[in-house]
């Protein structure tokens, strides 16, 4: 049985997550390290986490950084016939991807599942029934964006007051303030 289903995202005050295939804000090294640590760390000996992303998100990662190392990389696409070079798996939908994690080739290898973008994949995950956590980095200013994070339904999602391994105080890099939040739903 695969562990928890999670989304991880950094989002500006105006809910932006991307611009021209890149992040809308300058690179924030410690925020990126947080993403690496959260998506890579497995709590189960001998297992790896699975990162699920849409095709655009995959191609927005610099080629030298693909696949995201130390993680099993799965790309979602209805157009592609085989996984893009470097990706480990391809699925047509999030449901198909989650079914794949129950197959023998992955069931014993995958610990946590992390959804890393983009908008439509986040939306599909957030509307998925069952237990889901959202790891949201709130970038505390507006940035011009062309890609946005879906609205978080606070009827369904509860902001957790604290979470192990997640700093609760405001961070600052390059004059940009941000904070880490964790939301959880169980329906």
UniProtKB/Swiss-Prot annotation:
The reaction(s) this protein catalyses: (6S)-5,6,7,8-tetrahydrofolate + NADP(+) = 7,8-dihydrofolate + NADPH + H(+)
Catalytic activity, EC: 1.5.1.3
Residues binding NADP(+): 10, 16-22, 55-57, 77-79, 117-124
Domain DHFR: start-end pairs: 4-185
UniProt key word NADP: yes
Gene Ontology biological process terms in this record: axon regeneration; dihydrofolate metabolic process; folic acid metabolic process; negative regulation of translation; one-carbon metabolic process; regulation of removal of superoxide radicals; response to methotrexate; tetrahydrobiopterin biosynthetic process
CDD domains given in the database record: DHFR
Pathway connected to this protein: Cofactor biosynthesis; tetrahydrofolate biosynthesis; 5,6,7,8-tetrahydrofolate from 7,8-dihydrofolate: step 1/1
Consequence the record notes for mutating residue 23 to R: Strongly decreased affinity for methotrexate. Decreases catalytic rate constant 200-fold. Decreases affinity for NADP and dihydrofolate over 10-fold
Keywords: Cytoplasm, Disease variant, Methotrexate resistance, Mitochondrion, NADP, One-carbon metabolism, Oxidoreductase, RNA-binding
A Pfam family reported for this protein in Swiss-Prot or TrEMBL: DHFR_1
Chief place of localization: mitochondrion
Major enzyme class: oxidoreductase
Compartment annotation: Mitochondrion; Cytoplasm
Binding positions for substrate per the UniProt entry: 31-36, 65, 71
GO CC terms in record: cytosol; mitochondrion
Gene3D superfamilies with a match to the protein in the record: Dihydrofolate Reductase, subunit A (3.40.430.10)
Tissue: Widely expressed in fetal and adult tissues, including throughout the fetal and adult brains and whole blood. Expression is higher in the adult brain than in the fetal brain.
GO molecular function terms listed in the Swiss-Prot or TrEMBL record: dihydrofolate reductase activity; folic acid binding; mRNA binding; mRNA regulatory element binding translation repressor activity; NADP binding; NADPH binding; sequence-specific mRNA binding
Job description of the protein: Key enzyme in folate metabolism. Contributes to the de novo mitochondrial thymidylate biosynthesis pathway. Catalyzes an essential reaction for de novo glycine and purine synthesis, and for DNA precursor synthesis. Binds its own mRNA and that of DHFR2.
PANTHER family from the UniProt entry: DIHYDROFOLATE REDUCTASE (PTHR48069:SF6)
Record-stated family: Belongs to the dihydrofolate reductase family.
Disease: Megaloblastic anemia due to dihydrofolate reductase deficiency: An inborn error of metabolism, characterized by megaloblastic anemia and/or pancytopenia, severe cerebral folate deficiency, and cerebral tetrahydrobiopterin deficiency. Clinical features include variable neurologic symptoms, ranging from severe developmental delay and generalized seizures in infancy, to childhood absence epilepsy with learning difficulties, to lack of symptoms.
Oligomer and partners: Homodimer.
Protein's name in the database: Dihydrofolate reductase
Gene designation: DHFR
